[in-house]
Amino acid sequence: MAEFEGGELHYRGKVGTGFDAATAGELLARLEPLREGATAPEGVPREIMREMNWVRPLLSARIHYANRTADNALRHGVFRGLRDVGLSTPVSSTRKRLIAEADLATIWVTNPTRRLFGKTGPTKLDIAVYYALVGDFMLPHILGRPVSLVRCPTGLPKDCFFQRHAFTGMPPSVVTFEATNSEGETKSYLSVEGAKGYLALAQFGVVEFHTWGTHRASLDRPDQIVLDLDPGEGIAWREVVEAAVHIKDELGRLGLVPFAKTSGGSGIHITVPVTGKQNWKKLHQATSAIATHLATTAPDTFTTTMGKDNRKKRIFIDYHRNARGHTSAAPYSLRARTNLPASTPVSWSDLESIDAPQDLNYSSLPGLLATSGDPWAEIDEFARDLPTLRSSS
């Protein structure tokens, strides 16, 4: 067994109980395909190294144990099953193919085996393959929207950076346009306009996509708002889920139809499609009022005040992404951290059943989407007018 610590896998000992012969056979069938390209984790004793067959770290297990040894290995570990994730949304029979076989044939990356975020992390090719596999689901949510990119050209976290403007060698269907930001400054921005450009971005070390809440063709008429639930110190994942469900119910009372996605971290993004009748200033004022109203419905749970000291044991409702030029992680975007979790759209029923959002990642998500479909496929059909509330800000 091994666990991630500081971005690297570290050896945590062996587990020899908790499974019978049938379970062992099932595990072998799951593990055997993962042997190719595997490397040993840090801290493996020499005598163990000689007898082990290593696999790539793509499966998570539930292990019960008594305590840990001085070198942090698990003592008396018992296997309690794999921590699989599943999504229940049925496949849409009308799934639109946006990435053709010819587009897939154009994928090309240099240094395909370069690992990101540590010796046992995913490769540059893994990222290219992920975005190719989820493209039919992701592209409807990003095409034509202003986009910022997070690039990690060396694979080291310290070298990752935001790319908001044009860059050398940019794919043809990633276009630039000029617009004013929230400070009134004219800047050039990016927009992905086709599948080939989207797929080609993997060559440039693109790991994350962040989008505006509007389309390039109607910049001054935002068509969605995002409320980012950011948990403070001492808040567990289950509490964030319960808080999100509370907000869903409150937004429903305001006549809105909210959608949920994991942030790719410890939070949840609640996205609400709107009719685009308001400009950015009025939209930001409206979302400020909505966030303030939501916080008053459960003041011991929520805060709208920025700063870590204000969110201890509480959840910060970040509505500031709803200003001109501000972005949030796009649906199905990977996040540049260990094991590449994805910001994953989920149905509300699925959200309540998820125990470990980080398991929705570059490895697991393509297969889940192939069987479950996109729960946000019809999000635009639920656009509503924003209610008028009085903001205290």
Where in the sequence are the language-model features?
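C-terminal accessory nucleic-acid interaction domains of nucleic acid-metabolism proteins
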Residues: 10, 35-36, 46-129, 139, ...
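Conserved, mostly hydrophobic/aromatic
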Residues: 1, 131, 227
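Basic, low-complexity intrinsically disordered segments
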Residues: 148, 153-225, 231
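Extended, loop-rich substrate-binding clefts of extracytoplasmic carbohydrate-active enzymes
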Residues: 239-250
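Histidine-centered divalent-metal-coordination microenvironment in nucleic-acid enzymes
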Residues: 224-226, 258-279, 314-320
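Nucleic-acid 5′ end/cap handling module spanning
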Residues: 1-33, 73, 77-82, 238, ...
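Active-site palm subdomain of RNA-directed nucleic acid polymerases
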Residues: 248-262
